[in-house]
Amino acid sequence: MTGGNDPLLADGPGAPARRLARGITWLGVVLFWVVVVILARPVGLPLYDAILLAVLLAAVPVFSMAQLPLIDGVQIDRLSAYWSSIVTLWILGTACWFVGTRDMGATAVGLVWLAPVPLVLWSVGLTLAGMLVIVLFRPIASWAGGEDSRLLRQLLPRTRRERQVFALLSVAAGGSEELAYRGYAIPVLAPLIGTFGAAVLTTVVFGILHGYQGRLGILRTGVMGGVLAWGFLASGSLWPPIIAHTLIDLLAGIVFGERLLASRES
């Protein structure tokens, strides 16, 4: 989940947290321009691809991490967090759509329809695999003495209205994150670092993007991102990962909630 800062907080962060957030933000700015220059000059990508990849691989994950000091230990307004994330995700997804489909249309970002039976089988299979990752991480976390972050627990929907908006957030995340980090980024990066390298790089960034879930959550979403990347490449279509990602978020966030999260007592 990505979003803003002050509108999400019931209590403001302290000065040390703001300084740390500013430092991380400046790091993101520097990394963004470094990636743009490298991709546009020595590599020779078109400027719009260089800028968009720099946003996906540097700016978005680093700026997401910059939010963490601001929201550590404060009360979150969940609805504001959901809506700001929805807007951010749709902007990101729309940018990837326009840039990624400019030459070859929707097929360039993997939006290729499968026959009904393969579509259902791939979507269900990836959903089950993703849920299995979540379930298996509970005993792993217990063995390692880890637990899910307080922030992740706090962001889970509680009321009917929150569950409704969280469902919209799940759709936005499933569509936009898959379009950005699988459908757009992997095909653009594959000629530069190979398909495997592109899948690994985008999977690592995808995990870091979920830093609000804590170290355990970063690893878990990274593994899940790897599963979805494999599903995209193996099926030849982005639709199964989009459907699976959306269903996983709905199941984990609304249906099962905290019962799937790891704690030291579990």
Which functions belong to the PLM regions below?
Residues 1-111, 253-266:
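N-terminal, membrane-interfacial amphipathic/helix-forming hydrophobic leader that caps
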Residues 110-115, 156-160:
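Solvent-exposed, flexible loop/coil residues
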Residues 55-69, 132-147:
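Membrane-water interface of transmembrane alpha-helices
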Residues 97-113, 174-189:
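Alpha-helical transmembrane segments and their membrane-interface junctions
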Residues 27, 42-56, 86, 115-133, 222:
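Alpha-helical transmembrane segments
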Residues 78, 119, 150-151:
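Exposed alpha-helical structural elements
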Residues 3-11, 26-40, 131, 135, ...:
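Transmembrane helix-loop-helix hairpins at the membrane interface
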